[in-house]
């Protein structure tokens, strides 16, 4: 999904202005290109389902809102979002009986998350990075410009530290993490591969992301 948080592009403009919003949009578009390049150039077999993102309207009042947002994406950001009616959504993407329509965005990819993570691990090691598993950072102090990261196996010293923990780093680990990241519960259901008849019964016609 071509997004950078919960706010829509119109809300970006309201909060930070058009120039910043355009810069953020360009950054997200670039991130998709980088992602596609990484999995292509390094042969990361993460089963990408690259067919765009469907933002489904499950309430009638959402359709005018999404219609305005799609127009903004096209006219202000030069991005090819478009609207689908209920019938178009049913015919081309998913037979969702509660849907009133959807906004489709060209960028949206579903992946096998574990295969992607292990692919990144392989690539990092091939490029010379040292990866130490089972070594959580339990304490972080900074002295004279040097970071000291305490782990169960010893202390790592570094001039620079990149935090790549999503929203699940302890809030007290470092002052700059406090109130800047938010863990959000995500419930996932995994099934065996569905048969063609099961997919038809569920109404799925695409394997790309569907959200509301």
PLM features: what roles do these ranges have?
Residues 1-10:
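Short coil-to-beta-strand
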Residues 2-3, 58, 105, 190-191:
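Hydrophobic side chains in beta-strands
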Residues 12-123:
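Rossmann-like flavin
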Residues 48, 82-85, 131-133, 150-151, ...:
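General beta-strand structural signal in soluble alpha/beta enzymes
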Residues 84-96, 129-147:
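A conserved short coil-to-beta-strand element within the FAD-binding core of flavoproteins
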Residues 114, 127-130, 141, 164:
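Extended non-membrane alpha-helical scaffolds
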Residues 123-130, 197:
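Secondary-structure transition/capping motifs at alpha-helix termini
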Residues 139-212:
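Flavin-dependent oxidoreductases
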